[in-house]
Amino acid sequence: MRSLIISLNFNPGHVSHMLASYKQCEDLGYESVYYVNKKFVPFLPQKSNLSLFGGDNCPKADLAIFLFPSEKNLPLIWKLKRKGTKIVYIFHEPLAPLSVYKNAGFSTKYLARLWVIDHISALTVKWSDMVLIPSHKAVKYYEENSLYKNKNYYYLPLMYSDEREQRHKQLLKKNFSYIGTVAADHSFQEFLEFVEWAVENNRLKAYNFLIATKSEFVVPDSLRNHHRVFIHKGQPMTDEEINRYYASSFAIWNAYARTTQSGVLAKSFMFGTPAIVLRKNMNEFTHDGANVVVIDNNQDKEQIVNALKRIADNIDSFSSECRKEFEKSFYYKVYNNLFRTI
């Protein structure tokens, strides 16, 4: 049996998800093959089975797993189904009501783009044999959206392989970090303003601040070349770079204005790193005082400081609980039997 792990739009943040599906299919007896945009090649494990998307190339397979939306998915699904391939779509982000995105600060232009992406996703959903949805909130949005016609859907949390190795455990957890895309709903500006304030007022003196993103942004003058601030911006990161950033953090910014299911949260738990989250975004994976600390206002700097102190004072306990949640909810092997049956 052969499985294709498919991601046609390049995003290095997708590698962890792809790796988990690749390994899971191998565990279940498939010959796994990455079928991807060529830009992924340097970011994928060496000696992996690999086939590059392009032209009329359409490999034969028993199973094809599409991990992310793309207009390129649609003709490929059509070709694969003609060959008898079973299509599975891991639907990370069913569209919330547009008012949710507007309230989070997205522009009208971006809302129009979301509308287009959603209609492409709806066709991918319709043509798939099975749809996997990663959170209770995502299931709710899926069930409320009349565009999503496929009734053969299942709740299955985001899956990861365990990428934490001994070298990661040895890193000092010294950073409060923002990791991921700069986006309005991720409240990046609030994080940046907090870091400026903390540096200028010499708060949290024992700790440093990290921003790791492929996005571009203007670095405030007060943070340029500051010894307490490390910034990686404007270029993709390898999976190993991303992993080191998580492993060297004692807390992760997840106090987003809006989130359906955060891959940042899951990956921070992989490395035993707790997160700061907004109360309104608490979900089935987060437990205040155990693997996250809840705040009510991501602009309240003293509230953020108190949350970080709570984590720092109990880091061993928080880290242990994060690992437990990762192993229970996000480790792909937990779902091997379920995936086999559905």
Show which residues each predicted segment covers.
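Conserved donor-binding/catalytic core segment of Leloir-type glycosyltransferases
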Residues: 167-186, 192-195, 209
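A charged, aromatic-enriched C-terminal amphipathic alpha-helix characteristic of glycosyltransferases
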Residues: 299-302, 312-342
